[in-house]
Every structure is written in structure tokens, then in C-alpha cells.
Curated annotation (Swiss-Prot):
DNA repair listed as a keyword: yes
Lineage of producing organism: Bacteria, Bacillati, Bacillota, Bacilli, Bacillales
Domain remark in the UniProt entry: Has three domains with a flexible linker between the domains II and III and assumes an 'L' shape. Domain III is highly mobile and contacts RuvB.
Flexible linker as annotated region, ranges: 143-149
Compartments in which it is found: Cytoplasm
Name this polypeptide is given: Holliday junction branch migration complex subunit RuvA
Record organism: Staphylococcus epidermidis (strain ATCC 35984 / DSM 28319 / BCRC 17069 / CCUG 31568 / BM 3577 / RP62A)
Length: 200
């Protein structure tokens, strides 16, 4: 119904962003909302998918069309809901997920919250040879140095984002220890490092 929404990114939360256009604020669930942080109070175009349930109508948003297409492919798999698909895309690019599927790398897929061996195998069976992602798109952010207080705030927000994805307290403690060893300059960077720590 909505291919994309273009407007001002007015708010950013661990699980979603709010885009305002024509006086309406659209709440959009995203894999990693902090990837949009550089667009806060600026115009942004988010590729969207509307999912209608009995109790809600939810908008899901993505940084590019490839990420959106991978999300739509994943939620067609038995046992994969929007939350699980978002968790996968929060820490992997569509290209990386496609490679895991094509190489039948079940172990890679089971590293995400809510994805067991049976579900990982189902993803491979259902999607191998059917995913059309052809190249990896990057969304590199310009890095700026931050002070210690800002870094602590960045780490706190990153941990909240990971908690929202379903990671446990034990896993978050592991991430926090890892992040304290890095000089992180943005929440998006901290989330990426945290996710790499969890899947390594």
C-alpha cells in the first residue's frame, strides 16, 4: 500500500522512528532505528511495508529497497514473523542473509533471536534460489569523535536497542563489556559492534 514515506524524521526510538509528512506522524518499526540517526530533523525516505493484523496495522520501514525485499521474503517463511525478520536484518545486510541462504549456512541463521535449527532450515528450504538481492548496499555514516559522557550515552541507547530486539540480560552484559573496549562514535556503530559480538 505504501511503497515509501518521505518526510521529516522527527523522533527516534530503539524499535521505531516517527516520520512527519503533511501534518501526520507515521510510526515505523525498523530493524535498527539508529541507522537513521543522521537524518534526525531532516528529510528522509523510508521504504515501507504495511502489515495488517486483527488487532493492529503496523508499518515497517527500511533503509533501501533490498532490505525491504529481504524482509518480505523472510516473513513468508513458516515460523518467521516480522519481529524475527527485523532481528535478522538488524545485524545483517540483505546480501549477507542471501549468502547464508544460498550456502545453506544454518549455523549463521540460528545466531539470531528466535531462530532455531528447524526455522533456519525452513528459511533455506523456502528461499534458496528465490532471493533476488544481487549486491550489497552500504549506508556508511560519517564518524566524529565523542567525549566520554557521550560515549556512555551511546552505549546505553545501543543496549536498549538490542534489548528491544530480544537479546537476554546475559547477552547484553557481554555486549556492554565489548563496547567499553571500543571508542564508539554513534549508536548505530555501537549496535553494529554489539551484534557482531553476539554472532561471533
Amino acid at each position: 500500500m505504501y511503497a515509501y514515506i518521505k518526510g521529516t524524521l522527527s523522533q527516534l526510538f530503539p524499535t521505531h522512528v516517527v516520520v512527519e509528512t503533511c501534518g501526520i506522524g507515521y510510526e515505523i518499526q525498523t530493524p535498527n532505528s539508529y541507522r537513521f540517526q543522521k537524518y534526525l530533523e531532516k528529510e528522509v525516505q523510508i521504504y515501507t511495508s504495511l502489515i495488517v493484523r486483527e488487532d493492529a496495522q503496523l508499518l515497517y520501514g527500511f533503509i533501501n529497497e533490498e532490505e525491504k525485499e529481504m524482509f518480505l521474503s523472510l516473513i513468508k517463511v513458516t515460523g518467521i514473523g516480522p519481529k524475527s525478520a527485523l532481528a535478522i536484518l538488524a545485524s545483517s545486510t540483505p546480501h549477507e542473509v542471501k549468502l547464508a541462504i544460498e550456502n545453506e549456512n544454518d549455523a549463521y541463521l540460528t545466531q539470531f533471536p528466535g531462530i532455531g535449527k528447524k526455522t533456519a532450515r525452513q528459511i533455506v528450504l523456502d528461499l534458496k534460489g528465490k532471493v533476488t538481492i544481487t549486491e550489497e548496499n552500504s549506508d556508511d555514516l560519517l564518524q566524529t569523535q565523542v567525549n566520554g559522557n557521550e560515549q556512555n550515552q551511546i552505549i546505553s541507547e545501543a543496549l536498549l536497542a538490542l534489548q528491544a530486539l530480544g537479546y537476554s540480560k546475559r547477552e547484553l552484559t557481554k555486549v556492554e563489556k565489548s563496547l567499553n573496549k571500543h571508542n564508539v562514535n554513534s549508536v548505530d556503530e555501537a549496535v553494529k559492534i554489539g551484534l557482531q559480538t553476539l554472532v561471533s
